[in-house]
Amino acid sequence: MADKMQALGAQLTQALQETDEFKALKAAFATMKEDDATYKLFKRFQQIQMDLQQKQMAGQQVTDDEMSRARDVADQVAKIEAVKTLMDAERGVNALLNQLNQTITQPIQDIYAG
């Protein structure tokens, strides 16, 4: 049974890559990456987010300075058109994945609703 699930997962991976949403995300990322300054700022933003998340997960308090720095970088990133396009594309893929997750988990929801 696990092999069947793995095979279905591989098929879903392929199907996802063929969707317009995924293609838009891939193109938006490539466009954003072409501008070196934008890409570096985007990577910095990702790193700051990851650092803050890890700190919170470890039960550590995020300082006001860290939050201020994160907001500053987020504000800079949000003003860049290529990043806005990337974020829109991410929302499209996330919506698709949320729909898929609902479909997959419906039998589990049915068990608890029953």
Curated annotation (Swiss-Prot):
Coiled coil: none annotated. Gene3D superfamilies: YheA/YmcA-like (1.20.1500.10). HAMAP family: UPF0342. Belongs to the UPF0342 family. This is UPF0342 protein LVIS_1488. The lineage of its organism: Bacteria, Bacillati, Bacillota, Bacilli, Lactobacillales.
